[in-house]
Amino acid sequence: AIPCNTFGDVVARITDYSKAVLKTPWSCSGRGVRYVRDIDKNTERWIWKTLEKQGYIMVEPYYDKVKDFGMEFTSFADGTVRYEGLSLFRTLNGTYVGSVLATEDEKRSMLTKYIPKDLLDSICRYICDWMSREINGQYVGPFGVDMMIIKTHSGLKVNPCVEINLRRTMGHVALSLSPTTREQQCLMNIGYDGNSYHMRIINDHELLY
């Protein structure tokens, strides 16, 4: 992603990419994300408003996504970072809708259908080392890094940092509900009925990752 601090920079990047994803630096649960091919009046107003309030917009290519996933961590006051587990989740129009509840081994098996296990391990080590240096005790608590498997002309690849969430994520919630031994896999689903959000556990295997 490229940070753009002027309207002209944003337009130039969208033109370069043909179809782009625009993200506000600070947002939550997909609310600061726009998928843009052409800039209409609503998008133009949103860009100007975001630049005025937050100073810049992150612009990146629109990737041909295959799967969403993430890794969950905890950072400590001494600067160390501990890996907590994988997060396999589903989104709709960029907004989180549910997480797979399964053991770590089962989740790794799901992902290694697409990418090598060694790649997952190296990404995890890199994040632990890099975040330990960058945070260095300035933030203490849970955080998550969202990622995606994407399709390219040269095969499947990983975007290892779609965004970093310095908070307890739904991935952490899913880890606390996930089985520690092999059981029937479930989906932790978040739904909205027009008035409030509700969480439910779905056992339908066809809805899983």
Predicted features, each with a name:
Residues S18, D38-V97, G144, M148-C161, ...:
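Phosphate-binding site of ATP-dependent enzymes
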Residues S154-V158, L166-Y209:
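C-terminal active-site "lid" helix and adjoining low-complexity regulatory extension at the edge
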Residues E52-Q54, P61, Y83, T95-K157, ...:
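A long amphipathic alpha-helix within ATP-dependent nucleotide-binding catalytic cores
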Residues A1-C4, K19-W46, G70, G94-L111:
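Glycine-rich phosphate-binding loop of ATP-grasp-fold ATP-dependent ligases
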Residues A77, G94-V97, K107-S109, T181-R182, ...:
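Glycine/serine-rich loop-strand microenvironments at binding/catalytic pocket rims
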